[in-house]
Curated annotation (Swiss-Prot):
GO terms for biological process: translation. Keywords: Ribonucleoprotein, Ribosomal protein. GO terms for molecular function: structural constituent of ribosome. The keyword rRNA-binding does not apply. The gene is rpmI. This is Large ribosomal subunit protein bL35. NCBIfam families: rpmI_bact. The keyword Transcription regulation does not apply. Gene3D superfamilies: 4.10.410.60. One of its GO terms (cellular component) is cytosolic large ribosomal subunit. Belongs to the bacterial ribosomal protein bL35 family.
Length: 64
């Protein structure tokens, strides 16, 4: 049986942790002038992937 391939886009976006996967939050790439400093600071924090999305990500990262 051939090796399972890792989805490289998913590999770059998600990191495996003991409790699931962590990810970066969206809305911090452009159009930042109208967003408050507090909002941008909170968006810098990493967050957990929703439990319903974990199986799909785990399938795409077979060796994580």
């Amino acid at each position: 049986m051939p090796k399972m391939k890792t989805d490289k886009g998913v590999q770059k976006r998600f990191k495996k942790t003991a409790n699931g996967f962590k990810r970066k939050q969206a809305h911090l790439r452009h159009i930042l002038t109208k967003k408050s400093t507090k909002r941008k600071r909170h968006l810098r924090a990493k967050c957990q992937v929703a439990k319903s999305d974990v199986p799909a990500i785990a399938r795409q990262l077979p060796y994580a």
